[in-house]
Amino acid sequence: MLRSVPPQTGLLATRDTPLEVSQTSSSLKRLRSLMPSMAAVRQRPVHILVSPTCRRGFHEEVRIHQTHHPRIPAGLLLEVSDDLLCCGPELTFLQMAGETSLIGASVLGFELCGAYAHFSQMISGFYDRPALTSKVRISEALAKLPGARGIKRAKEAFALVLDGSRSPMETVLAGALSFPTCLGGCAFEQPHLNYEVILDQAATGVAGVSRCYLDLTWPAQKRALEYDGAAWHTDVRADRRRREALAHMGWTVNVIDLGDISSIAPLAGTVRLIQDCIPRESDEPIDLGNLKDLLGRLLKATRFGLGANAALFGVPVEKGLINVHL
């Protein structure tokens, strides 16, 4: 639901009062009447949360789960219709943490706390939207649900998440550089994502703007990595003047592109660029074999290279066999 209904539409309001779970129903007749309201959910079955006193009847498009929490706190549910609620981003993070890997849960956290969303269908790509939540709000939600299923994994994944990612590849790069060595990461100090730099008068004159936003940043060291994605960097001259302005301010900015992130050799080169100036949270050496494995898992979790053919056709279609126009 969170991927199918962009927040820009304003269709899902947050429920501002607690929900007594005893008020929920698993009546199949009632569920059938609500199915039109679930049309935005592209995948089936739809998962329904009810109290332990509700029957777990069978419906081919619905899977019913029972919760032993008597009350769901205010602010964790969204209103789809008068009689239908869906889990908000914080509760979704908790629930999915119990169903997926630690890497998968953390990548979901980056997405929920970032300004992008994957599509509801299992294809690569993403769309822009405002952040659905933040680390502060997820932390508050987890504190309200002690003992909930998946809470341990959710807290582990939460520690890895950063606010502010604008794309899956920013998430991949941040994860590879900041995740601990036990997960295969480089264990660099966590960067700030899309950090705001206020320019002085001279730098403003060069850049033509009074502030800049840097993709991955370590402010104390004035070091930054910029992901050179085609969607953001279409004005080469403006980018050059922006980087000249940042250099005037004492910043060192390294630019990387998709090829630098999607395979281990160029990523290792990026690591060498910053390893002498960015603090690490581990004394263990960076293991490039483990980093390669983590990179593969991060790319898979962000659907890298997962084409649209599986969503568009009912049979496997060899890449390049058909010209598709979207």
Task: Show the residue positions of the predicted features.
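Short gly/ser-rich loop at a beta-strand->alpha-helix junction or flexible surface loop bordering the NTP-binding
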Residues: 1-150, 181, 286, 293-326
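Surface segments flanking catalytic/ligand-binding clefts of nucleic-acid enzymes
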Residues: 128-326
